[in-house]
Amino acid sequence: MSGAESYRHITVLLNEAVDALAVREDGVYVDGTFGRGGHSRLILSRLGDAGRLIVFDKDPQAIAVAEELARSDKRVGVVHGGFASFQTALDGLGIGKVDGALFDLGISSPQIDDGSRGFSFRFDAPLDMRMDTTRGMSAAEWIAVASEQDLHEVIKNYGEERFSRQIVRAIVAQRAESPIDTTRKLAQIVAQNVRTRERGQDPATRTFQAIRIFINRELEEVGAVLPQVMCRLKEGGRLAVIAFHSLEDRIVKQFVKKYSQHEPLPSWAAVREADLPEPPLKIVGRALKPGEAEIAANPRARSAVLRVAERTAGPIPE
């Protein structure tokens, strides 16, 4: 078993997310977060010979799995990079409109469970946290140079951590003496400065989440890709997004809401809402969460939320 496959990953909302795409046999689809290919393989099983699937991932280990799949299935195209490059990547592959796009946001189980990646406080390892280990600044490098204000804003805003001030003061004091370059060092600093404990949650959870989100620009990428997908979806094409925490889910929810309804017209407007063109998106069903059986089999699925939207014939506002 290769290193890329040695950590088990259970795909969350597998059938629900792929069902939401309403896969057409000859369609062109995008899996913006390939991971270990759970969603991608199910999409491929529903595509005919003329169908096509483009997969994105930042993680070199995920890309190794994707490229192996592409060697055995010519319908698959692989993009090593973040999904914020959605339109540029499709242009490079000669692809115009697509029939659907799926995004399973956040961190994958193999990334968490591979202690050497530095995502988890459960292991003592170099403090890295990069999804793409071939580029960018590691968490340890950023912590070494970030201002106290930047540290505070990241931990407070991305981790929603009540004790961010205390944690940051301790980080600044510690790094003046020695580098904070391992997961254990950071976790110990946090634990010493979080005064109350949330049931079933390690005190380092929020701080690690915050730094990971910042290092990988996760929220910025979500905000950047959604309008690109809307522009590239064919009429009737579907967007399906699985989010795992409130910050990213809020971005998705607000985007879909904004483009699935009209702005309220002022009372003096000469035009009626009924005369306006339909909005470019329509919401498909309600937000879907995993059932009890899935959560029992995979506790990490507990916080997942699936939202789905469909492209209409309506124009995209400028």
From Swiss-Prot:
Binding-site positions, S-adenosyl-L-methionine: G37, G38, H39, D57, F83, D104, Q111
UniProt keyword Manganese, yes or no: no
One biological process term in Gene Ontology: rRNA base methylation
Oxidoreductase is among the record's keywords: no
One Gene Ontology cellular component: cytoplasm
Annotated localization: Cytoplasm
Predominant place of localization: cytoplasm
InterPro entries, per database record: RsmH, SAM-dep_MeTrfase_MraW_recog, SAM-dependent_MTases_sf
Role this protein plays: Specifically methylates the N4 position of cytidine in position 1402 (C1402) of 16S rRNA.
Family: Belongs to the methyltransferase superfamily. RsmH family.
Protein name per Swiss-Prot or TrEMBL: Ribosomal RNA small subunit methyltransferase H
Organism whose genome encodes this protein: Neisseria gonorrhoeae (strain NCCP11945)
Gene: rsmH
